[in-house]
Regions:
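Single-residue recognition of alpha-helix boundary sites
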Residues: 15-16, 115, 228
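A short hydrophobic/aromatic micro-motif that marks alpha-helical segments and, especially, helix-coil
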Residues: 19-20, 83, 165, 201, ...
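Outer membrane beta-barrel
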Residues: 24-164, 173-175, 181-190, 244-246
Length: 255
């Protein structure tokens, strides 16, 4: 009888351990994914002979899901020209493939080139549109609607504080907005229209952007134009233009 009790107790302990282990097992679809990009560069100024090395980016991101319809992302740059910057920190509700809602800190939906991560950029430096005009990250909420059949499209729009990433305690009488529409009428072609209103100080700034690109074989052809105007004609209008042609040379895996 005593031996039977011991065996029953042992079996209960093993069953409890197996149950606990099963409870601690994280389903594959909920396992977080870690991504990273390290980009170093060397620059030499031919006019005065000055030169320097630089770690332009050292980005690390963590993203995943906590529920089938709830996703998250956190991204930090440990060396943005020597400075540490928190880039993305948001949660996203995606009930289906048609629409989603995002809340947190993110890149504002605007332009084509500004949305490229460092590992997706075609050149050592970003374009003027991506770096000086359309490079905006802010805290707010966005909604996105997409269609994959008929006329494929993606429409994104959002409201943002307008005070950047560090002044999140400020209260605002008005919010910034940004809207971006992507049309994909045929395969490998994209037409993007976007507009944005920001209020950096006491003057509202309005920006309008149109861009398109087409990919075929090894080629990527892209053109983008941005118009920036200030309320009450406070400053001169700004015109920004970006165009390039890229040809990919594929190499065998392992080389």
């Amino acid at each position: 009888m005593k031996m039977r009790k011991i065996l029953v107790a042992s079996a209960f302990i093993i069953l409890s351990m197996a149950t606990a282990s099963a409870q601690l097992t994280i389903p594959k679809e909920y396992m977080p994914e870690v991504h990273g990009t390290i980009r170093g560069k060397y620059e030499h100024q031919t006019t005065n002979g000055m030169q320097r090395f630089q770690v332009r980016n050292a980005r690390v991101s963590l993203d995943g899901k906590v529920l089938p319809v709830i996703a998250y992302k956190a991204e930090i740059d440990l060396s943005d020209e020597g400075s540490i910057k928190m880039l993305d920190a948001y949660a996203r509700f995606t009930p289906n493939d048609t629409w989603n809602v995002t809340l947190g800190q993110m890149r504002v939906p605007f332009t084509i080139d500004a949305h490229r991560s460092p590992h997706q950029q075609y050149f050592a430096n970003r374009s003027f549109i991506a770096k000086q005009v359309g490079n905006v990250r802010d805290v707010g909420a966005t909604g996105a609607f997409s269609l994959k059949e008929g006329l494929p499209l993606k429409l994104e729009g959002g409201l943002f504080n307008g005070s950047g990433l560090t002044n999140q305690k400020e209260w605002h009488s008005t919010l910034n907005y940004s809207v971006k529409l992507q049309l994909m009428p045929w395969e490998n072609y994209n037409l993007t229209l976007s507009t944005q209103k920001i209020h950096p100080d006491k003057t509202s700034v309005y920006m309008y952007d149109i861009g398109t690109y087409y990919e075929f074989s090894n080629w990527h052809i892209e053109v983008e134009y941005l118009y920036k105007t200030y309320a009450k004609s406070s400053f001169d209008n700004v015109h920004a233009f970006n165009a390039f042609v890229n040809y990919d040379l594929f190499i065998k895996k392992g080389l």
